[in-house]
A protein has these predicted regions:
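Sec-dependent signal peptide recognition
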Residues: 2-8
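Repetitive helical segments and hydrophobic/amphipathic motifs
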Residues: 11-12
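C-terminal motif of bacterial Sec signal peptides marking the signal peptidase cleavage site
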Residues: 15-16
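Short, glycine-/small- and polar/acidic-enriched structural segments
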Residues: 21-165, 171, 183, 190-196, ...
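Pocket-lining segment of extracytoplasmic ligand-binding domains
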Residues: 99-100, 168-172, 176-265
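Proline/Glycine/Serine-rich low-complexity intrinsically disordered segments
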Residues: 129-136, 154-155, 159-161, 166-170, ...
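Secondary-structure end/capping motifs
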Residues: 232-307
Length: 310
């Protein structure tokens, strides 16, 4: 009798455990479906640890994006090419990038809608131990950059400005901003293209600036979305609300100053307090608008120039 009772209790325990396990699996499946539904409804934007993304970071922190149906998710990447891939493979609907890369994606078949022009600029920073102080000294030197990007176009500009044969300018593809900084610090490269706040970090380490893209007058930073996705009514409405939130964030930054968001920049861009303290004090952020025709023509002209050389 005692053995029978033990066996019965063991059977009941196994059944209870089995039900609990099946119930857990069912709940987990429901949670996964719900998470996937929310992710699908959210407007996903690929961002980088750079200052041109600050209005988006501020909009998120100040809860300006909460009015968007489905919400907004900022997905951090370390390289522009990874943002491109995420957009092409429909992992995100939009990205912070540059006009060269956006126009190239558009030409390849991923039609683009521009939301904003950012205040991004790039500085060509030489290794302080390389003794490079002028552009003309770049002959047979290695420059860290990203192919088919603003830094590629600017490298051509730099070479043309001193009639330097571009074949003697060794453009090394370093997509990750962190890798560029590490190679500069480890004296493994002669010069690199950097945007803020990484450019300020390099200057703090006494690496000299030999070219600044602002001298060209070009405005190449953009926030772009997949046109096909934005044609959907729900997405189009989300984009309208995003523009409103973005503009409010720009106003907040311009009113309070970039350094007011010191902790946010340190967290998102992974830089020290000293870097934020040393950022230029005149940084301003414009309301959302499309790229200028002259900038698009410049990018298109350089592309045609490259094709004619092949």
């Amino acid at each position: 009798m005692k053995k029978t009772m033990i066996a019965l209790l063991a059977t009941l325990l196994l059944v209870a455990c089995g039900q609990s396990y099946e119930e857990t699996k069912r709940i987990t499946r429901q949670q996964r479906r719900e998470a996937a539904r929310k992710d699908s409804a959210a407007l996903k934007i690929a961002v980088l640890p750079t200052l041109d993304c600050l209005p988006l970071f501020v909009a998120q922190q100040e809860q300006l994006l909460d009015t968007l149906n489905g919400g907004v998710r900022l997905k951090m990447y370390q390289a522009q090419m990874d943002c491109d891939t995420a957009l092409e493979r429909h992992r995100v609907e939009g990205m912070v990038t540059d006009l060269v890369r956006a126009m190239r994606l558009n030409d390849k078949g991923t039609k683009i809608r521009y939301m904003a022009v950012t205040g991004a600029y790039w500085q060509l920073i030489a290794n302080r131990l390389s003794r490079i102080r002028q552009i003309k000294q770049l002959n047979d030197k290695m420059i860290g950059m990203t192919r088919f990007s603003a830094t590629d176009l600017l490298s051509k500009r730099v070479a043309d400005s001193v009639k330097l044969n571009e074949e003697h300018l060794f453009k090394i593809q370093l997509n990750s901003l962190n890798v560029r900084m590490q190679m500069l610090q480890n004296n493994e490269i002669d010069a690199v293209w950097l945007t803020e706040p990484q450019a300020t970090m390099a200057r703090l380490y006494k690496h000299p600036v030999i070219f600044d893209s602002r001298s060209t007058g070009l405005q190449l930073g953009v926030i772009a979305f997949r046109e096909q996705e934005m044609r959907r009514q729900a997405r189009g409405h989300q984009l309208q609300l995003l523009v409103e939130a973005y503009n409010k964030a720009c106003d907040l930054i311009n009113e309070k100053g970039v350094k007011h968001y010191k902790k946010l920049i340190m967290d998102r861009c992974q830089v020290r307090a000293a870097v934020v303290d040393s950022l230029p004090s005149d940084l301003r952020f414009e309301h959302a608008r499309g790229p200028r025709q002259q900038d698009m023509e410049e990018v298109r002209g350089k592309k045609d120039e490259v094709r004619s050389m092949k």
